[in-house]
Amino acid sequence: MSDLYAHRESDEYLLKPEHFAEKKNRPKRWDCLRPIIYTSLAFVGFIEILFFGIFFAQATRKTPERLLGELNGLVGNFPARRVIFRSDPLAASDHKTEESRNATMNNWLSYMPRGNGFIAVNQTERYTLPPPIKQLGQDTYSIAVFHQLHCLYAIMSVYDDLAAAKSAADLNAHHSRDDTHSNEHPHEQVHVHSHDHVDHCFQYLRQSLLCCGDTALEGQDPRTDNPGTDGTGAVHICKDFDGILAWADSRRLVDAKHN
């Protein structure tokens, strides 16, 4: 190859060879963006996996059963509230006068809704329930707390009768949830306060106390210096009873109520 040809060949380069070397060594824009893009895609993928994982967990998780609530969700959900146990002078009679007994009865009635806490439930076969109470042409059930109150009042009423030395005839005049009271309101019932009924109330209330399992801490009885407690002054975490009472009253079967 002649020197002239070699010179000519080199002159045909539009750019000097050094320019290509610089361009080859310069990092491309894609090389700079690649880590950012990969990181972003990985982050989006992680978020999607997390989202679907949470969604799947929520879809398959069973709703937790509310403490002391109704298993099937047929009764409203009532909030918990702090309640200080206080003495109520009308909670028990003086065991002497009819006036005092009537005042106590009315005091207890204030905790009972109209209809005594019986409600109607449709399509009972869809739920986990015991056989319904057939009354007023409907399938009905008793809300437990009002049955419990009724039982406790029944025991106290018998105690009043014994304390006042009532006759056996008078013992047959009290109302209960066990026997038919009238054709108009078959859910209102009359019962002779026999041993069977009182024994039932003792057992039922014991079961209710065991179910509630109240673990509030109770302190010294303020009425005496002797070691002991009457339960007053302790703070308990309770359901909103006013809410329960209003809920039951709004779904009553009849307007009458009794202890």
From Swiss-Prot:
Disulfide bonds: none annotated. Glycans are attached at residues 102, 122. Oxidase; part of the gene cluster that mediates the biosynthesis of the secondary metabolite ustiloxin B, an antimitotic tetrapeptide. First, ustA is processed by the subtilisin-like endoprotease Kex2 that is outside the ustiloxin B gene cluster, at the C-terminal side of Arg-Lys, after transfer to Golgi apparatus through the endoplasmic reticulum (ER). Cleavage by KEX2 generates 16 peptides YAIG-I to YAIG-XVI. It is an enzyme of class 1 (oxidoreductase). It is found in: Membrane. Disruption phenotype: Decreases the production of ustiloxin B. The 2 HXXHC motifs are conserved in ustYa family proteins and might form active sites. Keywords: Glycoprotein, Membrane, Oxidoreductase, Transmembrane, Transmembrane helix. The lineage of its organism: Eukaryota, Fungi, Dikarya, Ascomycota, Pezizomycotina. GO terms for cellular component: membrane. A motif (HXXHC 1) lies at residues 147-151. GO terms for molecular function: oxidoreductase activity. Its EC number is 1.-.-.-. Its main location: membrane. GO terms for biological process: mycotoxin biosynthetic process. It is a single-pass membrane protein. A motif (HXXHC 2) lies at residues 197-201. InterPro entries: UstYa-like. This is Oxidase ustYb.
